[in-house]
């Protein structure tokens, strides 16, 4: 039985990956640092198949032992806040330490790292810089590394629409950060999890970068219009200049429960679409599902 370690497995994407990979019969180990329900994770597979456990850091003897015996390591772990520690520490240094442990594992077949679209171009964001540094380090230090750069991931329970929909339900006026012209190319979570399944099942070798996006490119204004249309509610979109938005979000970040932070706000400043230079779903014969249909289904539910 192939053994897979998934960092960040307790999150939205992680649970979908666990559910799909468990159906393939793999043993799945889910290390976690933040409080999570181990019982709910175990229920994603058959008895004894999913093994969640708490670890403080990568110096933990148990995690080191597991990492030296696993066949596949998937890292979804990331950070959106640098309040307590820098992005370089939480993202790059974590991946650096992780790879240095994995290099001692002769059984390891693949390292799969979840990145994001445009991290190689966004020099303003310290988070993007840390992620891109991690990409380069992983690719340079392991011969079978697969980097996945997904668009904004949609599906039941996703973080993006889960944040937007409550605002649309209660407010007639919807803030539109910037001019609303920046574009995004969302992708369905089932397509992303299928991509990972095929990478693992096919024992894909070599270094690869996949840009995982859906077929539809939308501006944020177009997306907002679709949401209001599918909700059957008339909404007025109020452009909010980025300077003002940053000032307001900066103030909100002082409080513990800010709905959005400056790093997340930066996504609205640039296009978040495929560059046509890396591999995509077609490489593994996957046809991504229509993103507008996914938005409609999520809104209607």
Model-predicted segments: where are they?
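N-terminal Rossmann NAD(P)H-binding glycine-rich loop of SDR-like oxidoreductase domains
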Residues: 4-26
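SDR active-site strand-loop-helix element
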Residues: 7, 31, 73-77, 111-117, ...
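Conserved glycine-rich Rossmann-like NAD(P)H-binding loop of the short-chain dehydrogenase/reductase
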Residues: 26-34
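NAD(P)H-binding glycine-rich loop region in Rossmannoid oxidoreductase-like domains
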Residues: 35-40, 44-97, 101-103, 117-121
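Substrate-positioning beta->alpha
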Residues: 159-161, 178-201, 208
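Mid/C-terminal beta-alpha module of Rossmann-like enzyme folds, strongest
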Residues: 198-261, 274-301
């Amino acid at each position: 039985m192939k053994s897979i370690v998934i960092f960040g497995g307790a999150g939205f994407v992680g649970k979908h990956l666990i559910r799909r990979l468990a159906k393939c019969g793999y043993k799945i180990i889910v290390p976690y640092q933040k409080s999570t329900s181990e019982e709910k994770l175990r229920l994603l597979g058959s008895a004894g198949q999913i093994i969640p456990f708490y670890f403080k850091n990568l110096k933990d003897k148990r995690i080191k032992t597991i990492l030296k015996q696993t066949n596949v390591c998937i890292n979804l772990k990331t950070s959106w806040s640098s309040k307590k520690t820098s992005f370089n520490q939480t993202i790059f240094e974590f991946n650096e330490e992780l790879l240095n442990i994995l290099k001692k594992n002769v059984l390891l077949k693949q390292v799969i790292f979840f990145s994001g679209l445009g991290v190689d171009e966004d020099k303003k964001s310290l988070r993007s810089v840390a992620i891109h540094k991690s990409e380069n380090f992983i690719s340079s230090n392991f011969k079978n590394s697969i980097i996945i750069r997904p668009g904004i991931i949609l599906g039941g329970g996703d973080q993006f629409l889960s944040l937007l929909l409550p605002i649309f339900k209660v407010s007639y006026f919807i803030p539109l950060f910037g001019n609303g012209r920046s574009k995004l190319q969302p992708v369905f979570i089932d397509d992303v999890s299928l991509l990972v399944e095929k990478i693992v099942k096919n024992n894909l070798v070599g270094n690869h970068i996949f840009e995982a996006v859906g077929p539809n490119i939308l501006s944020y204004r177009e997306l907002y219009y679709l949401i209001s249309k599918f909700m059957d509610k008339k909404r007025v979109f109020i452009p909010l200049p980025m300077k003002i938005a940053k000032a307001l979000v900066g103030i909100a970040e002082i409080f513990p429960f800010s709905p959005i932070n400056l790093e997340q706000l930066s996504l609205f400043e640039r296009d978040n679409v495929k560059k046509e230079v890396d591999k995509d779903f077609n490489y593994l014969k996957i046809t991504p599902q229509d993103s507008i249909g996914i938005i409609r289904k999520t809104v209607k539910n």
